């Protein structure tokens, strides 16, 4: 006969081992990434080393998001979603700027392509997946129409100001802003994003908290938050991982462009690759929240990432353009504008009721599939 309590102790031991393995992995990856960065900086690695560096880069991205999640858990919702969104945006800006520095005039549309891809991935891919998971879990996914509608309206306004208007201004020929117009778009984007942060975290915080099937607000999590020491440690490792991502992205940038060319894809696919790489960990986090019946948290992550991608990336690129050579084309093409317009229209119809079924999730995923197909075959 087994000793009393032996079966009860086994799950706890397994859980402890899993936690230790996760802790070791998340602590070691940022350190290893910095070592790899120091050893490979300024070199032109061969193909096998490029693959290794790429794997380390992906690990650094995953590690950064993991530590951002720990910090986010410490500060609670909806602040946590903001921490994740800003961390992901820092990685995105780093990848864009490093590729633009190395690519010159050939990367004039890289910022536009990446930001638009991030908007399509989050507003269609991530939202569609999370609505699907939420509806499968509870037949009907519920969320706050007020908070989600505010976020969607902000994303639509930011996208129009930064990605659509450049096609219709007259100061510059082509889909470009003049320096003054670019400065206005950057300031307006920052102001809108800052206002949304205030609304989400202070003025109407309850609009962004998860809700139950009957509309009751869920203002607490079952898991105990990390200690202040754990949160500070994760903050330090997060900064370390972000530095590693910036440096490794610069080393990997020629390989990314060569891979896109070898696959016969258009140059705009580079932006899609960057957005997919950067948003993959956050997509997993949003899907996990949806499976835990926290669809509102998933929507906060998705729309918050889209908003940060436009509202923070465009100002950062505007500042970086002072030192970058070549033009900065932000205006979308006709096909992309159509996709953006239908995404906003479908998003409004999805958000207004505050409830969504499998059908709404399927519609968003169909739009995401159309975006991917047209990105590969314009």
Roles of regions detected by a PLM:
Residues 2-378:
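Hydrophobic alpha-helical segments, chiefly the membrane-spanning helices
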């Amino acid at each position: 006969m087994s000793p009393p309590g032996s079966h009860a102790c086994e799950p706890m031991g397994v859980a402890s081992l899993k936690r230790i393995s996760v802790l070791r992995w998340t602590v070691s990856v940022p350190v290893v990434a910095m070592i790899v960065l120091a050893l490979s900086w300024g070199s032109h690695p061969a193909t096998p080393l490029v693959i290794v560096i790429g794997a380390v880069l992906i690990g650094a991205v995953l590690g950064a998001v993991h530590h951002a999640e720990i910090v986010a858990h410490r500060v609670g919702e909806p602040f946590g979603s903001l921490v994740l969104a800003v961390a992901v945006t820092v990685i995105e800006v780093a990848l864009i700027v490093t590729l633009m520095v190395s690519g010159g005039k050939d990367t004039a549309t890289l910022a536009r392509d990446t930001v638009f891809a991030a908007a399509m991935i989050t507003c269609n891919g991530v939202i569609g997946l999370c609505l699907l998971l939420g509806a499968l879990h509870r037949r009907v996914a519920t969320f706050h129409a007020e908070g989600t509608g505010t976020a969607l309206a902000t994303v639509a306004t930011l996208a129009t100001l930064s990605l659509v208007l450049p096609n219709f201004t007259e100061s510059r020929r082509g889909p470009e802003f003049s320096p003054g117009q670019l400065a206005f778009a950057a300031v307006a984007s920052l102001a809108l994003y800052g206002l949304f942060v205030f609304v989400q975290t202070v003025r109407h915080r309850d609009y962004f908290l998860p809700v139950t099937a009957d509309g009751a607000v869920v203002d607490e999590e079952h898991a105990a938050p990390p200690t202040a020491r754990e949160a500070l440690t994760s903050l330090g490792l997060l900064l370390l991982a972000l530095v590693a991502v910036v440096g490794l992205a610069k080393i990997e940038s020629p390989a990314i462009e060569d891979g896109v060319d070898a696959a016969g894809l258009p140059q705009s696919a580079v932006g899609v690759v960057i957005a997919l790489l950067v948003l993959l960990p956050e997509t997993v986090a949003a899907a996990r929240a949806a499976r835990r019946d926290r669809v509102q948290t998933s929507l906060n992550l998705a729309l918050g990432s889209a908003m940060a991608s436009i509202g923070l990336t465009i100002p950062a690129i505007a500042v970086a353009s002072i030192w970058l050579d070549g033009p900065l084309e932000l205006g979308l093409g006709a096909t992309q504008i159509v996709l953006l317009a239908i995404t906003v229209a479908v998003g409004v119809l999805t958000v207004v009721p505050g409830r969504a079924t499998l059908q709404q999730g399927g519609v968003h995923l169909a739009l995401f599939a159309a975006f991917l197909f047209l990105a590969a075959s314009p």
